[in-house]
């Protein structure tokens, strides 16, 4: 063994002796003052000391200062000659190669020493608290003193030598690495490696972005295609609704519109084709037409509302004994006129006699007129007499019609519309067209509209003058005279 190695071993043995004394004597004395069992309490003391040195900075500095004093006493070196910094360098230099000792600063040496001591204390405490060593430390201490301390010193020296070899290898590996010549080159190499990693991340993100954009484009095309199909279907449906609303047996337009989604009416392209105001007007007009068609359909089905033609479609020449309807009369009014005419014929009166008789007595009075009955029954009510008096001042409808005989209806209309010459021209044109149609000798055309219309019943009178209904009805009745059968 050379002198250098002997110097290193002496330093390691001094280091081991200090900490073995702490574990074997100092911590054992602290465990004796506790109430728990000595074994358990000694284990707590060992663990507490290890954690305190590692985690508590003040406890570590106190421990290092105590070790510095112990080292000076053992080596018999004056503390003035060996200061604290030299002490740290002496301990650390025994673990690292000499060629690196001068290149390492004092701060780095202090950090290396702290790591070495914490690691050493942790391993030594673990070895002492094993089942092999713990009984010899607690029991029969005097008999086992030399044996236990020797084993602890051997373990301490072996661990420190092993640690020295590890540090040597680290420094040798570092020496094999070619360091940059300057600090700038080192910074450049570090930034270059970091830049390469960033470029790799950028490439990955770019490829991911491209894939996402491709997926987005595909989804957008699908969406536009579906949207166009949807708008086309909605427009076709709306056109179908408009066509169906014009038919008589159409479903109400509002029912179809309610089934449509609200997005259909808020579509931009659809709003351009049909604005909102125009669409509302169209819908309102369609609804009005639908209601009008429905009302006309119901009116046409009613038997009391059959129209009576005003032109020469059925009756070619008016008859003296058969009334020709001049207004929109019903079948009931027509039958009543027939009955009145038959009664007059039965009693031997003709139409001329009835007219002459009516001229002498224009008003037929009853035995008790309505006014006299009202006055007789309401003598105590003077208000009703006043009402009748007021009524006398008002001409009746017959007088009004007599006054208006000199002014036909057309003249009244033309007189009322003097300020509108175009209206007068339209009325005159219509009148001329009617006169031209009457003067033309056109054949009688059966109106197909009246195929299912009511047909006048043919009356047959017996010898007593009473009429009886015939079971035969003519489908081509032309409004001629009624046949009287007295056979």
From Swiss-Prot:
Q: Which domain of life is it from?
A: Viruses
User: According to Swiss-Prot or TrEMBL, what is its membrane topology?
Assistant: Single-pass membrane protein
What causes induction of this gene?
Expressed in the late phase of the viral replicative cycle.
Parts forming coiled coils: 196-235
Q: Is Transport included in the keywords of this UniProt record?
A: no
Sorted alphabetically, the Gene Ontology cellular component annotations on this record are: host cell membrane; membrane
- Disordered: where is this region? 294-324
Q: Which residues are glycosylated?
A: 73, 83, 195, 462
For this UniProt record, give its keywords in alphabetical order, as a comma-separated list. Coiled coil, Glycoprotein, Host membrane, Late protein, Membrane, Transmembrane, Transmembrane helix
* Locations listed in the record: Host membrane
Q: Does the keyword Metal-binding apply?
A: no
Q: What are the transmembrane regions?
A: 7-28
Q: Which family does it belong to?
A: Belongs to the asfivirus B475L family.
Query: Under what name is this protein listed?
Result: Uncharacterized protein B475L
């Amino acid at each position: 063994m050379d002198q250098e190695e002997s110097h290193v071993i002496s330093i390691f043995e001094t280091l081991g002796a200090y900490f073995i004394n702490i574990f074997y004597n100092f911590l054992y004395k602290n465990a004796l003052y506790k109430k728990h069992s000595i074994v358990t309490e000694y284990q707590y003391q060992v663990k507490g000391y290890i954690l305190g040195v590692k985690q508590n900075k003040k406890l570590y500095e106190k421990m290092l200062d105590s070790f510095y004093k112990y080292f000076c006493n053992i080596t018999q070196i004056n503390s003035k000659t060996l200061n604290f910094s030299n002490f740290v360098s002496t301990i650390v230099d025994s673990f690292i190669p000499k060629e690196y000792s001068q290149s390492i600063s004092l701060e780095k040496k202090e950090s290396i020493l702290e790591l070495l001591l914490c690691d050493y204390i942790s391993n030594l405490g673990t070895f002492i608290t094993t089942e092999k060593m713990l009984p010899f430390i607690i029991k029969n201490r005097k008999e086992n003193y030399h044996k236990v301390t020797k084993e602890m010193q051997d373990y301490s020296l072996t661990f420190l030598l092993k640690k020295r070899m590890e540090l040597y290898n680290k420094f040798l590996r570092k020496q094999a690495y070619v360091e940059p010549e300057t600090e700038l080159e080192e910074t450049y190499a570090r930034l270059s490696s970091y830049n390469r990693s960033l470029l790799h991340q950028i490439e990955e993100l770019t490829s991911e972005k491209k894939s996402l954009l491709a997926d987005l484009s595909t989804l957008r095309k699908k969406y536009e295609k579906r949207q166009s199909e949807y708008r086309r279907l909605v427009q076709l449906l709306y056109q179908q609704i408009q066509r169906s609303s014009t038919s008589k047996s159409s479903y109400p337009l509002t029912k179809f519109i309610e089934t449509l989604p609200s997005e259909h009416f808020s579509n931009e392209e659809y709003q351009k084709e049909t604005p909102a105001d125009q669409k509302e007007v169209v819908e309102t007009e369609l609804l009005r037409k639908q209601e009008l068609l429905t009302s006309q359909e119901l009116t046409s089905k009613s038997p009391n509302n059959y129209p009576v033609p005003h032109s020469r479609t059925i009756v070619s020449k008016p008859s003296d004994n058969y009334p020709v309807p001049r207004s929109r009369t019903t079948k009931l009014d027509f039958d009543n006129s027939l009955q009145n005419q038959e009664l007059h014929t039965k009693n031997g009166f003709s139409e001329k006699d009835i007219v002459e008789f009516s001229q002498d007595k224009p008003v037929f009075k009853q035995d008790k007129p309505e006014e006299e009955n009202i006055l007789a029954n309401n003598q105590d009510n003077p208000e009703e007499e006043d009402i009748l008096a007021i009524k006398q001042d008002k001409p009746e409808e017959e007088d009004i019609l007599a006054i208006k005989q000199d002014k036909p209806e057309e003249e009244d209309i033309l007189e009322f519309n003097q300020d509108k010459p175009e209206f007068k021209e339209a009325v005159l044109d219509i009148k001329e067209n009617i006169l031209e149609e009457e003067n033309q000798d056109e054949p009688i055309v059966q109106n197909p509209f009246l195929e299912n219309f009511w047909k006048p019943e043919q009356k047959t009178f017996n010898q007593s003058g009473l009429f009886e209904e015939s079971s035969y009805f003519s489908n081509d009745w032309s409004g001629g005279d009624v046949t009287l059968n007295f056979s």
